[in-house]
Amino acid sequence: MGSYHYTSTSHFFFAGGGEGEYSSYKGTGSTDTHRPTTVRIPVTTPGPERPPDDAAAARIQAAFRGHLVRRHAAAVRGADDEATRLERLLRRQETVDAVRGDERERARFSEALMAVLLRLDAVPGYYPAVREARRAVTRRVVGLQEVFDAVLAAPDAADTCGVPASLDQVLEGIWGESPAAPPPPPPPPPPAAVEVEEEVVRSPCWRRFFGGV
């Protein structure tokens, strides 16, 4: 079968009054009964949302900062424990005698104090809490060094009748405080009083009074 072309020549005509069933198809002359209404829609600008990558990075950084603070606080706490141990040693009379009589003991104790200071210097002070704790422990160790130097600078044994100076005497020289000293012994009686007492004891009346023969 061959192809063919179809052309329509139909025309539609409506009533001239513009009224009727098909009056809405006219381009002009129709009355619009539905007027468009304007509705206001509020438009809000949403806040900038943080991308998932940025939120994850912030959480990782916060966790890492917390880890650093805990590690630095543990280092300061360890240095404080070492300072407490050295302070207890320095309060013992055996330690005082050892550091004053032996050069090696003196160097060993001094190196222990310097090692504590080096441990504190290795702790960074980025965070305020860690910085304040490190400063307090550093002051404590410096005070121990001053006491240690005062122990070494105490008077020799010859000034104390052959007995080394105690830590109480050293602290008395530093702070001007001393424990309550025992009262001095009473002076011996004069020779004349001793002779009179011996004569009284040798007399027969007193011997009879005390039950002697």
UniProtKB/Swiss-Prot annotation:
Keywords: Chaperone, Mitochondrion, Stress response. Pfam families: BAG (PF02179), IQ (PF00612). Disulfide bonds: none annotated. Residues 53-82 form the IQ domain. GO terms for molecular function: calmodulin binding; protein-folding chaperone binding. InterPro entries: BAG5/6/7/8 (IPR040400), BAG_dom_sf (IPR036533), BAG_domain (IPR003103), IQ_motif_EF-hand-BS (IPR000048). Residues 75-152 form the BAG domain. The keyword Metal-binding does not apply. It comes from the Eukaryota. It is found in: Mitochondrion. Disruption phenotype: Mutant plants display enhanced saline-alkaline stress tolerance. Induction: Induced by salt, sodium carbonate and heat stress. Induced by abscisic acid (ABA). GO terms for biological process: protein folding. The keyword Transmembrane does not apply. Co-chaperone that regulates stress responses. Acts as a negative regulator of saline-alkaline stress tolerance. May participate in stress response through regulating the homeostasis of iron, manganese and zinc ions. Interacts with CAM1-1 under normal conditions. Dissociation of the interaction when calcium-CAM1-1 binding increases under saline-alkaline stress. This is BAG family molecular chaperone regulator 6, mitochondrial. It comes from Oryza sativa subsp. japonica. The lineage of its organism: Eukaryota, Viridiplantae, Streptophyta, Embryophyta, Tracheophyta.
